Protein backbone atom coordinates (compact mmCIF):
# COMPACT_ATOMS: atom_id res chain seq x y z
CA UNK A 1 0.00 0.00 0.00
CA UNK A 2 1.15 3.52 -0.80
CA UNK A 3 1.20 6.11 1.80
CA UNK A 4 -0.80 9.23 1.36
CA UNK A 5 2.31 11.10 0.33
CA UNK A 6 3.18 8.55 -2.30
CA UNK A 7 -0.34 8.57 -3.74
CA UNK A 8 -0.26 12.36 -3.95
CA UNK A 9 3.02 12.26 -5.83
CA UNK A 10 1.72 9.67 -8.29
CA UNK A 11 -1.34 11.80 -8.93
CA UNK A 12 0.87 14.77 -9.70
CA UNK A 13 2.92 12.72 -12.13
CA UNK A 14 -0.22 11.44 -13.87
CA UNK A 15 -1.64 14.96 -14.24
CA UNK A 16 1.66 16.18 -15.66
CA UNK A 17 1.64 13.37 -18.22
CA UNK A 18 -1.93 14.15 -19.32
CA UNK A 19 -1.07 17.84 -19.78
CA UNK A 20 1.99 16.93 -21.81
CA UNK A 21 -0.07 14.53 -23.94
CA UNK A 22 -2.75 17.17 -24.51
CA UNK A 23 -0.14 19.77 -25.44
CA UNK A 24 1.48 17.36 -27.86
CA UNK A 25 -1.87 16.56 -29.47
CA UNK A 26 -2.70 20.24 -29.90
CA UNK A 27 0.71 20.84 -31.40
CA UNK A 28 0.18 18.04 -33.88
CA UNK A 29 -3.20 19.46 -34.82
CA UNK A 30 -1.60 22.85 -35.41
CA UNK A 31 1.12 21.31 -37.52
CA UNK A 32 -1.43 19.34 -39.60
CA UNK A 33 -3.48 22.49 -40.12
CA UNK A 34 -0.38 24.36 -41.26
CA UNK A 35 0.49 21.57 -43.66
CA UNK A 36 -3.03 21.64 -45.07
CA UNK A 37 -2.86 25.38 -45.65
CA UNK A 38 0.53 25.02 -47.31
CA UNK A 39 -0.81 22.23 -49.48
CA UNK A 40 -3.74 24.38 -50.60
CA UNK A 41 -1.41 27.28 -51.27
CA UNK A 42 0.86 25.06 -53.31
CA UNK A 43 -2.09 23.82 -55.34
CA UNK A 44 -3.09 27.42 -55.99
CA UNK A 45 0.37 28.34 -57.13
CA UNK A 46 0.42 25.31 -59.42
CA UNK A 47 -2.95 26.27 -60.91
CA UNK A 48 -1.83 29.84 -61.50
CA UNK A 49 1.37 28.57 -63.05
CA UNK A 50 -0.59 26.29 -65.36
CA UNK A 51 -2.95 29.09 -66.33
CA UNK A 52 -0.05 31.42 -66.92
CA UNK A 53 1.61 28.77 -68.99
CA UNK A 54 -1.55 28.33 -71.07
CA UNK A 55 -1.92 32.06 -71.47
CA UNK A 56 1.67 32.41 -72.56
CA UNK A 57 1.21 29.60 -75.02
CA UNK A 58 -1.97 31.21 -76.42
CA UNK A 59 -0.30 34.59 -76.66
CA UNK A 60 2.65 33.05 -78.42
CA UNK A 61 0.33 31.26 -80.83
CA UNK A 62 -1.58 34.48 -81.55
CA UNK A 63 1.62 36.42 -82.07
CA UNK A 64 2.93 33.71 -84.36
CA UNK A 65 -0.33 33.67 -86.34
CA UNK A 66 -0.32 37.46 -86.66
CA UNK A 67 3.28 37.45 -87.77
CA UNK A 68 2.49 34.76 -90.33
CA UNK A 69 -0.49 36.75 -91.67
CA UNK A 70 1.56 39.95 -91.86
CA UNK A 71 4.35 38.15 -93.65
CA UNK A 72 1.87 36.64 -96.11
CA UNK A 73 0.30 40.05 -96.79
CA UNK A 74 3.73 41.59 -97.27
CA UNK A 75 4.67 38.81 -99.66
CA UNK A 76 1.42 39.31 -101.63
CA UNK A 77 2.04 43.07 -101.84
CA UNK A 78 5.61 42.40 -102.92
CA UNK A 79 4.42 40.02 -105.62
CA UNK A 80 1.83 42.56 -106.83
CA UNK A 81 4.45 45.30 -106.92
CA UNK A 82 6.82 43.01 -108.77
CA UNK A 83 4.10 42.12 -111.28
CA UNK A 84 3.27 45.81 -111.79
CA UNK A 85 6.93 46.65 -112.19
CA UNK A 86 7.39 43.83 -114.67
CA UNK A 87 4.33 44.97 -116.60
CA UNK A 88 5.66 48.53 -116.56
CA UNK A 89 9.01 47.33 -117.80
CA UNK A 90 7.46 45.02 -120.38
CA UNK A 91 5.34 47.69 -122.17
CA UNK A 92 7.44 48.99 -125.03
CA UNK A 93 6.78 50.46 -128.43
CA UNK A 94 5.93 53.70 -130.17
CA UNK A 95 2.71 55.60 -130.80
CA UNK A 96 2.10 58.25 -133.45
CA UNK A 97 -0.89 60.58 -133.55
CA UNK A 98 -1.98 63.51 -135.69
CA UNK A 99 -5.02 65.70 -136.22
CA UNK A 100 -7.12 68.04 -134.11
CA UNK A 101 -5.29 71.05 -132.69
CA UNK A 102 -8.16 71.47 -130.21
CA UNK A 103 -7.41 68.06 -128.70
CA UNK A 104 -3.62 68.33 -128.88
CA UNK A 105 -3.03 69.93 -125.43
CA UNK A 106 -4.84 67.05 -123.73
CA UNK A 107 -3.03 64.37 -125.74
CA UNK A 108 0.32 66.08 -125.11
CA UNK A 109 -0.31 66.17 -121.36
CA UNK A 110 -1.58 62.58 -121.24
CA UNK A 111 1.45 61.43 -123.23
CA UNK A 112 3.86 63.04 -120.75
CA UNK A 113 2.16 61.32 -117.81
CA UNK A 114 1.92 58.00 -119.66
CA UNK A 115 5.64 57.99 -120.44
CA UNK A 116 6.38 58.51 -116.75
CA UNK A 117 4.53 55.25 -116.10
CA UNK A 118 5.99 53.47 -119.13
CA UNK A 119 9.43 54.94 -119.90
CA UNK A 120 10.11 52.50 -122.73
CA UNK A 121 7.21 53.88 -124.79
CA UNK A 122 7.71 56.80 -127.20
CA UNK A 123 4.82 59.01 -128.35
CA UNK A 124 4.85 61.54 -131.20
CA UNK A 125 1.90 63.92 -131.60
CA UNK A 126 1.30 66.36 -134.46
CA UNK A 127 -1.61 68.68 -135.19
CA UNK A 128 -2.54 69.45 -138.81
CA UNK A 129 -6.32 69.48 -138.33
CA UNK A 130 -8.97 66.82 -137.94
CA UNK A 131 -9.16 66.12 -141.67
CA UNK A 132 -5.43 65.49 -141.88
CA UNK A 133 -5.48 63.27 -138.80
CA UNK A 134 -8.33 61.17 -140.19
CA UNK A 135 -6.59 60.91 -143.56
CA UNK A 136 -3.32 59.75 -142.01
CA UNK A 137 -4.88 57.14 -139.71
CA UNK A 138 -6.96 55.84 -142.63
CA UNK A 139 -3.80 55.47 -144.71
CA UNK A 140 -2.01 53.76 -141.83
CA UNK A 141 0.73 56.39 -141.47
CA UNK A 142 -0.20 57.12 -137.82
CA UNK A 143 -1.67 54.96 -135.06
CA UNK A 144 -4.23 57.55 -133.93
CA UNK A 145 -6.19 60.21 -135.79
CA UNK A 146 -7.47 62.95 -133.47
CA UNK A 147 -10.65 64.64 -134.61
CA UNK A 148 -13.27 67.18 -133.55
CA UNK A 149 -15.74 65.60 -135.97
CA UNK A 150 -16.89 62.10 -136.80
CA UNK A 151 -14.87 60.29 -139.45
CA UNK A 152 -17.81 60.27 -141.86
CA UNK A 153 -17.59 64.08 -142.08
CA UNK A 154 -14.11 63.96 -143.65
CA UNK A 155 -13.74 60.50 -145.22
CA UNK A 156 -15.77 58.46 -147.67
CA UNK A 157 -18.03 55.73 -146.31
CA UNK A 158 -15.60 52.86 -146.95
CA UNK A 159 -12.70 54.62 -145.22
CA UNK A 160 -14.82 55.72 -142.28
CA UNK A 161 -16.07 52.18 -141.64
CA UNK A 162 -12.49 50.92 -141.26
CA UNK A 163 -11.89 53.21 -138.28
CA UNK A 164 -12.71 52.56 -134.63
CA UNK A 165 -13.90 55.58 -132.64
CA UNK A 166 -12.57 56.21 -129.12
CA UNK A 167 -14.60 59.14 -127.75
CA UNK A 168 -12.50 60.76 -125.03
CA UNK A 169 -13.98 64.09 -123.89
CA UNK A 170 -16.01 67.23 -124.65
CA UNK A 171 -14.41 70.34 -126.14
CA UNK A 172 -15.98 73.82 -126.05
CA UNK A 173 -15.11 76.40 -128.74
CA UNK A 174 -15.06 80.08 -127.79
CA UNK A 175 -15.09 83.22 -129.96
CA UNK A 176 -12.09 85.35 -128.98
CA UNK A 177 -11.29 89.00 -129.76
CA UNK A 178 -8.38 91.35 -129.31
CA UNK A 179 -8.59 93.05 -125.92
CA UNK A 180 -9.23 96.46 -127.49
CA UNK A 181 -12.50 95.14 -128.94
CA UNK A 182 -13.85 94.12 -125.55
CA UNK A 183 -12.56 97.32 -123.96
CA UNK A 184 -14.48 99.15 -126.70
CA UNK A 185 -17.75 97.58 -125.54
CA UNK A 186 -18.12 94.18 -127.24
CA UNK A 187 -18.73 91.52 -124.58
CA UNK A 188 -21.76 89.69 -125.97
CA UNK A 189 -22.95 88.99 -129.51
CA UNK A 190 -26.13 87.44 -130.79
CA UNK A 191 -25.75 84.43 -133.02
CA UNK A 192 -26.92 86.52 -135.97
CA UNK A 193 -24.30 89.19 -135.27
CA UNK A 194 -21.67 86.46 -135.14
CA UNK A 195 -22.89 85.05 -138.46
CA UNK A 196 -22.77 88.49 -140.08
CA UNK A 197 -19.22 89.08 -138.82
CA UNK A 198 -17.78 85.73 -139.94
CA UNK A 199 -19.51 85.74 -143.32
CA UNK A 200 -18.17 89.24 -144.05
CA UNK A 201 -21.47 91.12 -143.93
CA UNK A 202 -20.45 93.17 -140.87
CA UNK A 203 -16.98 94.71 -141.29
CA UNK A 204 -16.66 97.35 -138.55
CA UNK A 205 -16.99 96.84 -134.81
CA UNK A 206 -19.06 99.99 -134.40
CA UNK A 207 -21.91 98.16 -136.18
CA UNK A 208 -22.27 95.90 -133.14
CA UNK A 209 -21.62 98.49 -130.43
CA UNK A 210 -17.84 98.37 -130.47
CA UNK A 211 -14.99 100.71 -131.39
CA UNK A 212 -14.73 102.33 -134.79
CA UNK A 213 -12.22 99.94 -136.31
CA UNK A 214 -12.20 97.27 -138.96
CA UNK A 215 -12.98 93.67 -138.12
CA UNK A 216 -10.06 91.34 -138.90
CA UNK A 217 -10.99 87.68 -139.32
CA UNK A 218 -8.42 85.13 -138.21
CA UNK A 219 -9.62 82.01 -140.02
CA UNK A 220 -8.98 78.29 -140.33
CA UNK A 221 -8.64 76.03 -143.41
CA UNK A 222 -11.51 73.83 -144.55
CA UNK A 223 -9.71 70.74 -143.21
CA UNK A 224 -10.11 72.04 -139.66
CA UNK A 225 -12.47 70.19 -137.35
CA UNK A 226 -12.63 73.25 -135.10
CA UNK A 227 -13.86 75.27 -138.10
CA UNK A 228 -16.45 72.60 -138.93
CA UNK A 229 -17.72 72.64 -135.32
CA UNK A 230 -17.83 76.45 -135.13
CA UNK A 231 -19.60 76.78 -138.48
CA UNK A 232 -22.18 74.16 -137.53
CA UNK A 233 -23.07 75.37 -134.05
CA UNK A 234 -22.10 79.06 -133.93
CA UNK A 235 -22.83 80.06 -137.54
CA UNK A 236 -25.77 77.69 -138.14
CA UNK A 237 -23.92 76.08 -141.05
CA UNK A 238 -23.05 79.32 -142.87
CA UNK A 239 -19.66 79.28 -144.62
CA UNK A 240 -17.20 81.67 -143.05
CA UNK A 241 -15.38 84.19 -145.20
CA UNK A 242 -11.76 83.47 -146.01
CA UNK A 243 -8.78 85.58 -144.99
CA UNK A 244 -5.79 83.74 -146.40
CA UNK A 245 -3.31 86.18 -144.89
CA UNK A 246 -4.54 85.18 -141.42
CA UNK A 247 -5.48 81.54 -142.04
CA UNK A 248 -4.01 78.87 -139.76
CA UNK A 249 -5.07 75.61 -138.18
CA UNK A 250 -2.51 75.93 -135.40
CA UNK A 251 -4.58 77.13 -132.46
CA UNK A 252 -1.51 78.56 -130.74
CA UNK A 253 -0.67 80.65 -133.81
CA UNK A 254 -4.30 81.73 -134.19
CA UNK A 255 -4.43 82.82 -130.56
CA UNK A 256 -1.24 84.85 -130.97
CA UNK A 257 -2.56 86.50 -134.16
CA UNK A 258 -5.75 87.61 -132.39
CA UNK A 259 -3.71 88.88 -129.43
CA UNK A 260 -1.36 90.91 -131.65
CA UNK A 261 -3.87 92.32 -134.15
CA UNK A 262 -6.19 95.21 -133.33
CA UNK A 263 -9.80 94.47 -134.26
CA UNK A 264 -9.13 90.73 -134.65
CA UNK A 265 -11.62 87.92 -133.98
CA UNK A 266 -11.20 84.16 -134.16
CA UNK A 267 -12.10 81.05 -132.15
CA UNK A 268 -10.24 78.39 -130.17
CA UNK A 269 -10.97 75.56 -127.77
CA UNK A 270 -11.18 76.43 -124.06
CA UNK A 271 -8.05 74.35 -123.55
CA UNK A 272 -6.07 77.28 -125.00
CA UNK A 273 -7.63 79.73 -122.55
CA UNK A 274 -6.89 78.14 -119.15
CA UNK A 275 -4.30 80.77 -118.20
CA UNK A 276 -3.94 84.44 -119.04
CA UNK A 277 -4.19 84.07 -122.80
CA UNK A 278 -4.05 87.83 -123.49
CA UNK A 279 -7.35 87.83 -125.41
CA UNK A 280 -11.01 88.24 -124.45
CA UNK A 281 -13.83 85.73 -124.91
CA UNK A 282 -17.25 86.80 -126.16
CA UNK A 283 -20.60 85.43 -124.95
CA UNK A 284 -23.17 84.18 -127.46
CA UNK A 285 -26.75 85.27 -126.75
CA UNK A 286 -25.79 85.94 -123.14
CA UNK A 287 -24.15 82.54 -122.53
CA UNK A 288 -20.48 82.64 -121.61
CA UNK A 289 -18.26 79.92 -123.14
CA UNK A 290 -17.62 77.88 -119.98
CA UNK A 291 -17.68 74.18 -119.12
CA UNK A 292 -20.50 74.81 -116.63
CA UNK A 293 -22.70 76.36 -119.34
CA UNK A 294 -21.74 73.58 -121.74
CA UNK A 295 -22.72 70.88 -119.21
CA UNK A 296 -26.03 72.66 -118.55
CA UNK A 297 -26.89 72.93 -122.24
CA UNK A 298 -26.78 76.76 -122.19
CA UNK A 299 -23.77 77.23 -124.45
CA UNK A 300 -24.12 75.79 -127.97
CA UNK A 301 -20.62 75.54 -129.47
CA UNK A 302 -19.12 72.23 -128.35
CA UNK A 303 -18.45 68.74 -129.63
CA UNK A 304 -17.17 65.35 -128.55
CA UNK A 305 -13.50 64.70 -129.22
CA UNK A 306 -12.53 61.48 -131.00
CA UNK A 307 -9.33 59.45 -131.21
CA UNK A 308 -9.64 57.04 -134.14
CA UNK A 309 -7.63 53.90 -134.84
CA UNK A 310 -7.66 51.80 -137.99
CA UNK A 311 -9.25 48.65 -136.66
CA UNK A 312 -8.60 47.64 -133.08
CA UNK A 313 -5.43 49.23 -131.66
CA UNK A 314 -2.26 47.31 -130.83
CA UNK A 315 -1.37 46.70 -127.17
CA UNK A 316 0.65 49.84 -126.53
CA UNK A 317 -1.85 52.12 -128.31
CA UNK A 318 -4.78 50.51 -126.51
CA UNK A 319 -3.06 50.96 -123.14
CA UNK A 320 -2.54 54.66 -123.92
CA UNK A 321 -6.17 55.16 -124.98
CA UNK A 322 -7.40 53.30 -121.89
CA UNK A 323 -5.26 55.57 -119.74
CA UNK A 324 -6.73 58.75 -121.28
CA UNK A 325 -10.26 57.46 -120.65
CA UNK A 326 -9.52 56.21 -117.13
CA UNK A 327 -10.76 57.78 -113.90
CA UNK A 328 -7.13 58.36 -112.99
CA UNK A 329 -6.61 60.77 -115.89
CA UNK A 330 -10.23 61.93 -116.18
CA UNK A 331 -9.88 63.86 -112.93
CA UNK A 332 -7.39 66.16 -114.68
CA UNK A 333 -9.38 66.92 -117.84
CA UNK A 334 -11.33 69.88 -116.51
CA UNK A 335 -8.20 71.64 -115.27
CA UNK A 336 -6.99 71.53 -118.89
CA UNK A 337 -10.23 73.06 -120.19
CA UNK A 338 -11.90 69.85 -121.42
CA UNK A 339 -15.29 68.55 -120.40
CA UNK A 340 -16.11 65.12 -118.98
CA UNK A 341 -18.63 63.42 -121.27
CA UNK A 342 -20.65 61.90 -118.41
CA UNK A 343 -21.40 65.39 -117.02
CA UNK A 344 -23.34 66.48 -120.10
CA UNK A 345 -27.00 66.96 -119.16
CA UNK A 346 -27.99 67.43 -122.79
CA UNK A 347 -26.08 65.89 -125.66
CA UNK A 348 -28.27 67.51 -128.32
CA UNK A 349 -27.46 70.96 -129.70
Model-flagged regions — what are they?
Residues 55-56, 61, 66-67, 72-73, ...:
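Exported/periplasmic ABC-transporter solute-binding proteins
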Residues 31-41:
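Bacterial N-terminal signal peptides that target proteins for export
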Residues 44-48:
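Alpha-helical transmembrane segments
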Residues 10, 38-39, 81:
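Sequence-pattern detector for short linear motifs
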Residues 49-53:
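C-terminal motif of bacterial Sec signal peptides marking the signal peptidase cleavage site
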Residues 4-31:
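Short, Lys/Arg-enriched N-terminal segments with co-localized hydrophobic residues
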Amino acid sequence: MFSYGQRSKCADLLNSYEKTKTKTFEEEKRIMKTRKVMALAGAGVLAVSMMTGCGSSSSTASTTAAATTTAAAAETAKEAATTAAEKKADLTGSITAAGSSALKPLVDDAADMFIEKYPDVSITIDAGGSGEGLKQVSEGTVNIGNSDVEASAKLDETQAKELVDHQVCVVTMAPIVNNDVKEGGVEDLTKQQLIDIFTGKTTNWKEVGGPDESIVLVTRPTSSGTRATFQKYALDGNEEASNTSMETDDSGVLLQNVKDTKGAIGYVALSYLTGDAGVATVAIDGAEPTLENTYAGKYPVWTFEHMYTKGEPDEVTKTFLDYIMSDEYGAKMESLGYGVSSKMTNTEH
